[in-house]
UniProtKB/Swiss-Prot annotation:
Pathway stated in the Swiss-Prot or TrEMBL entry: Alkaloid biosynthesis; taxol biosynthesis; taxa-4(20),11-dien-5alpha-ol from geranylgeranyl diphosphate: step 2/2
Family per similarity comment: Belongs to the cytochrome P450 family.
Main location: membrane
Name of the protein in question: Taxadiene 5-alpha hydroxylase
Organism: Taxus cuspidata
One Pfam family this sequence matches: p450
Residues reported in the UniProt entry to bind heme: 445
Amino acid sequence: MDALYKSTVAKFNEVTQLDCSTESFSIALSAIAGILLLLLLFRSKRHSSLKLPPGKLGIPFIGESFIFLRALRSNSLEQFFDERVKKFGLVFKTSLIGHPTVVLCGPAGNRLILSNEEKLVQMSWPAQFMKLMGENSVATRRGEDHIVMRSALAGFFGPGALQSYIGKMNTEIQSHINEKWKGKDEVNVLPLVRELVFNISAILFFNIYDKQEQDRLHKLLETILVGSFALPIDLPGFGFHRALQGRAKLNKIMLSLIKKRKEDLQSGSATATQDLLSVLLTFRDDKGTPLTNDEILDNFSSLLHASYDTTTSPMALIFKLLSSNPECYQKVVQEQLEILSNKEEGEEITWKDLKAMKYTWQVAQETLRMFPPVFGTFRKAITDIQYDGYTIPKGWKLLWTTYSTHPKDLYFNEPEKFMPSRFDQEGKHVAPYTFLPFGGGQRSCVGWEFSKMEILLFVHHFVKTFSSYTPVDPDEKISGDPLPPLPSKGFSIKLFPRP
């Protein structure tokens, strides 16, 4: 029955490319509508015999998608989930992006979804994300293929490997602050941290230092990201169409880089560990098989997306939150100056120094708790699942969300307050499956340590260069349109240089 459904949808996509005036289009569309109606009736009859979670599915194929997307863009997802939890409980059904979906709230629900990959559930992305990220990335691969892909990326993102890249990242951040921040009375934070985060990726992923080339790639990425949240309509004038074109252009550039790097590796003018591109090109699985070009292309698309969003959001929001919590900012300053006091003039930050930035990382964690860069992720049930007295049918989507734990006083005391100290002692007082800014389980973000390193080094160099700052508009709102949550106007600040 699922195969029939998929073939019907495929046929629909095919006939929608026909001239709408043709009689064949009308006949085909009527037939498809009839088949889909029969499928809905069949599924409805089967599901009526099951004890499904409470909730409402709404209009077929549409459900509550528009309400959900509106909440996403207005930064009111917490309210969306809270209203349904209050009405239906911690387990409820809805319909999102064309699929019946069960939302599991709280740490128990998070644990069920995140700890049962390929046992009860498997990763599920909306179709437009799959088209833009590709089917061969670490984010989309499943089972053994996913494990192999994570193994390939560990050669770059593992803590041992990251230590060798501190120097390059440190140099780029210091250069960026000297060029874009130092000597300025006022700056707008968001566009600057976006530029910095992307340029770091361009250098450490592809060894691209040329600013014009960095800008060109950055614009392509922005086009792809905006299209990720647009209606999946592949027609001129639509954001999704522009995103697909951007991905095609990105592929062309990447293929040229891959070809050149293969030649350089063979000649010895490039090393196997100089950047992520070299790491992926020289990786071999336990059978001695290298990654294909498509696998490398899709991973770069996925990683550029993930590393960009999950880092720019906390980097920008740290400024906003610390500006309204000056006592916390002073603790950050004290920690960073203490590290500097133990360094010789011109001596660079080391991995040991990063490990000593405990309070600074607590500030970043609290920022991620209050404004998680991801609201959660979807999975698909690969078997009927029994949970909390309900049946979640095979084929239905499941959604876990950070909004069911991050802002709740059941898990975090006075959650509305900015309290970095709640993460002291390595966060041992934080209950499992309640703090999930980078996901969890087998699919936790492979690059979270990379993101952590960027944030800590950036804060260090800012404190080293400036004694303080004040916001131009302390009450600037946070927007989630598009994801992730960000200052709606970029958050302008006045800078006061260190004497």
